[in-house]
Amino acid sequence: MAIAKEDILAAVEGMTVLELNELVKAFEEKFGVSAAAVAVAGPAAGGAAAAAEEKTEFTVVLAEAGSNKVAVIKAVREITGLGLKEAKDLVDGAPKPVKEGVDKASADEAKKKLEDAGAKVELK
């Protein structure tokens, strides 16, 4: 004797949240499955660019100094106004934020200066 889908749906519809939770656990044990949500890959670069454009504040992060460390230190000094020692410590401690809470234009400008000096930079 088979039970119709409508009968099952009607039974589930009348259950409380606690009863539904117990039902899900019983399904997991009986069939060896998990009710955890599956992570779905989002759109590639287009989606990330759209999300970045919606942000109003950015953090410029120095990911890696690269091979021309002196030029990167000079760029950090120019962007932040730090002294030589502070700029060198920041570059040596990469990955570190260079500027925080800046608008898109300032973040892009700082990123360009650092990349032109040979650094790897991320905007967050």
Swiss-Prot record:
rRNA processing keyword on record: no
Signal peptide coordinates: none
InterPro entries hit by this protein: Ribosomal_bL12, Ribosomal_bL12_C, Ribosomal_bL12_C/ClpS-like, Ribosomal_bL12_oligo, Ribosomal_bL12_oligo_N_sf
Pfam families assigned to the protein according to its UniProt record, in alphabetical order: Ribosomal_L12 (PF00542), Ribosomal_L12_N (PF16320)
A Gene Ontology molecular function term of the record: mRNA binding
GO biological process: translation
UniProt GO cellular component terms: cytosolic large ribosomal subunit
Summary of the function given for this chain in its UniProt record: Forms part of the ribosomal stalk which helps the ribosome interact with GTP-bound translation factors. Is thus essential for accurate translation.
Assembly information from the UniProt record: Homodimer. Part of the ribosomal stalk of the 50S ribosomal subunit. Forms a multimeric L10(L12)X complex, where L10 forms an elongated spine to which 2 to 4 L12 dimers bind in a sequential fashion. Binds GTP-bound translation factors.
HAMAP family with a match to the protein in the record: Ribosomal_bL12
PANTHER family: 39S RIBOSOMAL PROTEIN L12 (PTHR45987), LARGE RIBOSOMAL SUBUNIT PROTEIN BL12M (PTHR45987:SF4)
Protein name as annotated: Large ribosomal subunit protein bL12
Taxonomic source organism: Burkholderia mallei (strain ATCC 23344)
